[in-house]
Swiss-Prot record:
Its EC number is 4.2.1.80. This is 2-oxopent-4-enoate hydratase. Gene3D superfamilies: Fumarylacetoacetase-like, C-terminal domain (3.90.850.10). One of its GO terms (cellular component) is cytoplasm. The lineage of its organism: Bacteria, Pseudomonadati, Pseudomonadota, Gammaproteobacteria, Pseudomonadales. It comes from Pseudomonas sp. It comes from the Bacteria. Pfam families: FAA_hydrolase (PF01557). Keywords: Aromatic hydrocarbons catabolism, Lyase, Magnesium, Manganese. The keyword Magnesium applies. Stable up to 35 degrees Celsius. InterPro entries: Fumarylacetoacetase-like_C (IPR011234), Fumarylacetoacetase_C_sf (IPR036663), Hydratase-Decarb/MhpD_sf (IPR050772). It is an enzyme of class 4 (lyase). Strongly inhibited by Fe(2+), Fe(3+), K(3)[Fe(CN)(6)], Ag(+), and Cu(2+).
Length: 261
């Protein structure tokens, strides 16, 4: 199986480098989600060997509707690297994206390691420095987004780029469950949501991640960014698009795409 994992990981990596999406890989993953994560990890190690630095994790499949659609009962996660970080309002070269779609999220920044067993919600809150509004630019190495849970897990949870807002906000006094979200493109509303759409509360998603990573031996560390999951529908991006997301209590963030090169 390790040889097959290496082959599939290489195909996904080549798809990213060549900017040419490939056919779904799920038909070659007989070991289920565990095997898909093993494939993901091969490419994580490839990125580290290339000099990339881990900056955090992203959580996907936090919507009950999407979970039902894909036939799963849990979220998934991927790894964020420094090469994926984009400043608020910075122009994103279209060549950095692959079938990009945008979704608005609550980002959490961790200030203390969460490396012990039986992490509680209070542990998570105490370890969180602040929250920020975020736009995640997801991308798929699988052609036409023809994915199921195995495809997206193997493909680093369809991670692409991420944009964080500039103004950190402490959790105290925030009601992230009821925080409304509006995302606009060129001034037109394209996505509407609320914190409760993310596993009932963005902190629920982050707690799931923290516990899962401890079990896998790769816990959240001080300084990590956690993209907690979409608050509303994701929207396909086109060259030249400018997205702005506003999240109640957190402010706004913009993702600005260059014209096609």
């Amino acid at each position: 199986m390790s040889e097959q994992n290496a082959k599939l990981a290489a195909l996904l990596n080549e798809a990213e480098l060549s900017e040419k999406p490939i056919e779904p890989v799920r038909g070659h993953i007989e070991g289920g989600i565990a095997q898909a994560y093993a494939i993901q990890q091969i490419n994580v190690q490839r990125q580290l060997a290339a000099g990339r630095r881990v900056t955090g994790r992203k959580i996907g499949l936090t919507s009950a509707a999407v979970q039902k659609q894909l036939g799963v009962d849990q979220p998934d996660f991927g790894t964020l690297f420094d090469s994926m970080a984009v400043n608020d309002g910075e122009e994103i070269a279209w060549s950095r994206t692959l079938q990009p779609k945008c979704e608005a999220e609550v980002a959490l920044v961790i200030e203390r390691d969460l490396d012990h067993e039986n992490i509680t919600l209070i542990d998570l809150i105490g370890a969180t420095a602040y929250a920020l509004p975020a736009i995640e630019v997801v991308g798929s190495r699988i052609a036409n987004w023809d994915i199921n849970i195995l495809d997206t897990v193997a493909d680093n949870a369809s991670a692409g780029l991420y944009v964080l807002g500039h103004t950190p906000v402490k959790l105290e006094g925030l009601d992230l469950r009821l925080a409304g979200m509006v995302m606009e493109r060129a001034g037109q509303q394209v996505s509407l949501g609320v914190g409760a759409a993310c596993l009932g509360h963005p902190l629920n998603a982050a707690l799931w991640l923290a516990r899962t990573l401890v079990k896998q031996g790769t816990p959240l560390k001080s300084g990590d960014v956690v993209l907690s999951g979409a608050l509303g529908p994701l929207v396909a991006a086109n060259p030249g698009d400018v997205f702005e997301a506003r999240i109640q209590g957190l402010g706004s963030v913009r993702a600005c795409f260059s014209p096609a090169s």
